[in-house]
Amino acid sequence: MNISFFGGVQEVGRSCFVLEANGRKIMIDAGLKIGGKPEEKAPLFPLEQASSIDCIIITHAHIDHTGWLPFLAKNGFLGKIFATKPTRDIMHLLLSDAAAIAKENKEKFYSTKDIDRTMELVQELEYDAETQIMQGIMLTFLKSGHILGAAQALLEMNGKNILFTSDFNNRDTNLLDAAEFPNKKIDVLFMESTYSGKKDLLPSLKNASKELADTVKKALKRHGKILIPVFAVGRGQEIMFVLENYIRSGYLQGLTIFVDGMIGRANKICRHNVVYLRAEIPNRILRADDDPFKSPFIKTPKTKNKKDVFKEKNAVILATSGMLSGGPSIFYLQKLIGEKKNCIILVGYQAPESLGRKLLDGAKEIEIRKKKFLVKAEIKNIHFSGHADFNGLLGFAIKVNAEKIFLVHGEKQKIPELQQEIEKKLGKTVAVPALLEKIELE
């Protein structure tokens, strides 16, 4: 039994591992990297070998875990793709949007036909339902708390329990319960390490929410507009709920929330899959006057040039994409970045080389579609992350206490900080795989 790493190690993005056991090849996630160099966007697995993969396990719908699937389907992969029902629904939306953005940027990409071919291969699995996916190989999805439908993948084979956490959040959010803890002894743990630096300590939801409301209030006082670039699923709804609560309380009186890009369609998917969200959300929907997805304070732009948004006196704009890699958030950024009264609030992880990361790093000038813009607007970073922070990752690894621990999905320069701390606490070696490395697990 061995595992090979074709992406998503010592980097964030293009997650793609291949586990070989019992004469079978199982791929765990098949993503693309957002931002960065074109040659580093795809996993390093040879596409001409797509037909050699027996099945694929998809942990959640984000493009850095799913964006490569249509390329595999296009090149001969015919096996099953295992995912939760919400992941299947969201995946179709995000893959279609990625294809549209690529077309806009004149990149070679997959077609609608390739997406349809991919979706036909998806087999939905429920959480906590142990399923035989191959002879002698069992799969159980555990809740990961990352986004709607996201899962940890627990594989049982050859007498071993192997857990892939994928992206997980060990704290409750407005939408989701915290990640489940496995109820079986784990032999091999593959744990994400997005926030693996000792300084990566994230605020509580309560503190982040208050900071967001205060930042919005200050910008409105100086007659500015606020842009919050968000992922369509997860952060989009999280921020929407927070702002809507502050409007209802009277703290952000007169505020209008504009949602643009895929957020509206993502909201419909969330509402359709409401049984997978925290229990209080279905209860709110049952009370007709308190449906968070149909709030009177939330609007979509009515005109193509967004004039109605800019005419609104008190406006917050939630727009995709969350790292400013495409979508309408780019349009709003160009309009707002050049005035001091405006505010750009970054609320999620920003990948190295992404436009969002450049703003976080204090860039004085940015380039959008070959045009330069001076950065004069206030740039604010308020964490509403769907990931565990340094302490959350450390605590999870200690509690699981697996025989073998591998850190994946993290920034190369930060991972050693978490690695050393886990080794110190548990007194065992923690491995950090390299790209194209193959490791024996028995």
Which functions belong to the PLM regions below?
Residues M1-I57, H62-T66, F71-E238, E244-Y251, ...:
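His/Asp/Glu-rich metal-coordinating catalytic cores
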Residues E20-N22, E156-N158, A179-N183, V242-R248, ...:
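Short, solvent-exposed amphipathic alpha-helical segments in soluble enzyme
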Residues L201, L205-S209, F293-N305, M323-S325, ...:
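A general structural motif
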Residues L212-V347, A351-P352, V408:
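Hard-cation-handling environments
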Residues G338-L374:
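Redox- and metal-dependent alpha/beta enzyme cores, enriched for Fe-S-associated oxidoreductases
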Residues E367-G395:
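Generic long, charged, amphipathic alpha-helical segments
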Residues A402-E403:
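Proline-aspartate-enriched helix->loop->beta-strand connector
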Residues K414-I439:
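Short acidic, glycine/proline-enriched helix-loop-strand junctions
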